[in-house]
Amino acid sequence: KKQFGIGSIDSKRSFIDELKSFKENIEIRHTLTYRSSKAPKNNSTKTVSFQINHSIILLPTELMPIRYLDPRVGWFNLKKYNYSSEELKSDEIRVIQRWRLEPKDLDAYAQGELVEPIKPIVYYIDPATPIKWRPYFKKGIEDWAKVFEKAGFKNAIIAKSAPSEEEDPNFSLEDVRYSSIRYVATTTRNATGPRVSDPRTGEIIESDIIWYHNHLRSYRNRYLLETGAANPKARTLDTPEGEIGEMIRRVISHEVGHALGLPHNMKASSAYPVDSLRSGSFTQKNGIATTIMDYARYNYVAQPGDENIRFVRQLGPYDDYSIEWGYRFFPMKTSETEKVSLRKMVDKKSMNPLYMYGSGGNDPKTQTENIGDDPIKASYYGIKNLKIVVSNLDEWTTKKGQSYEDLNELYNETIGVYRRYIYHVIKMIGGINETVMVKGQDNVPYQSLNAKEQKRALSFLGQNLWQTQSWLMNPNLISKIKSKGILKVLQNLQFSALNQILSIRRLNRMISAENTIIGDGLSPEALIEKLFHTFFKENMPLDDSVMALQIRFTERVKKLVNENELNPKLKSTLLAFQKLIYKTAKKKTKIGKVSEKNHYLYLTKISEIP
């Protein structure tokens, strides 16, 4: 709306394109035209048109019993308010979104037998899906069947091929009675797992998972970059069908998880020790994270020579636990009385790292695209592998007679992978460990990451970020794909990282944590001192990157002194370091090469205090 400056609707240019009616829903596709103050060029009508679909869905006549959210278990949920509460306030209520699964045989279910649900969850595979990928789509859906057995159900989720028009002329993927996985021909590199739920109870009525064709490209590239050093099967852009198929299967499982009601659990990837991820027996049994719902896509920790390694994610113990909690049927209990049984289930497991849930915040153990319990060690292994990949990138991506287009694409994505490994460590600085818990459980939800670990992180960055990363600047490689700009790209990565570390938000958070959060965290003063000694180390050889970092650090310190939003406590420290930079630079203006003298002259100019 803001992009096009959309105003009122133009009724003369708006109309219904198509209307379809089914037993439980109506689908209306129409073109809506709006007056626009920022219409695209060469548009004399000053309007923009959009094709929009609206769905009108008949809700169930019989309400499904609700299940209240326990925040220690990740679940998509609806927020409601109870205005009849006796608590002298309106109570906020969270109701989870889930399918209506009820056992056919209540007596057998009560005896602990596996029982089929009255109405299983059925997904129809889009006929547009390439034939060779359909078995992997089916496996990705039905992998959850084993998980549902933990909740007492067998054959709870089923994958079927969509019938042809000859087989069933009334079948349509637009019919709300049929959930589906759609295969969409587009350059988008993604997959999604949306769902439609009853706003009264949270009952999931239908979902249409979408697989975008070009998502294959993302997985092909990242498989090579993140596992190629230790995984011979990944050392090509002609990824074997079985390997790509396994990746598709796991993406489908992830999206089905969303459609079942599960959100991302970004804490799950930090449960396993980093060194265990180098063990073939461990990874084959346990995977690389405790859930498929984390963004822990690849095992980038395993090193060349490690044997029988699992490189791709799979379902794990957290998936069993969360599905059992969400779908276990309690026939003799109400939504209120079942809370006791459900709470006991969570109390037993929620403090075990295998079953912890976390969605974000400032917790270094709740990150995306990471694996292992130690971000520093994991990133060390990741960068070590990436160096091997870069040294072989030309050979692995380009065949004789081909252009260097793929090499260029993979090199650019290499920078992105390297950046992720670096930022996994940056999050430790000023980090606060967050554990979702309730009163009565040991410890407290928030604790500062101890200073020793934060100093380890700074030392890692000193070696792997602030020092010139010559392995990313190999002229024999760069000369094939770029005529300019690589040095600037890498310097901008350093500058962006420095700005992140010395952001007002992070520094204020560190000051606040010093005074209000349990734990021996790193002080912001110690952080600034460590960075100063990193950038202005005695007798440190100067190259373009070091000089640029010294300038950027000086500019950042100077700017922070004048920031109104920064806690005043820190400004005297910053001013003292600004003076120290001036003093250090002043000493060096009369020694060394001309270029170095000029550099330090400039530093004295920008650090001088009027």
Where are these regions (language model features)?
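Soluble non-cytosolic domains of exported or imported proteins
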Residues: S90, P127, I131-K139, G242-M247, ...
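Zn2+-dependent metallopeptidase catalytic core
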Residues: K132-A156
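Conserved catalytic/binding loops enriched for acidic/polar residues
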Residues: S269-P610
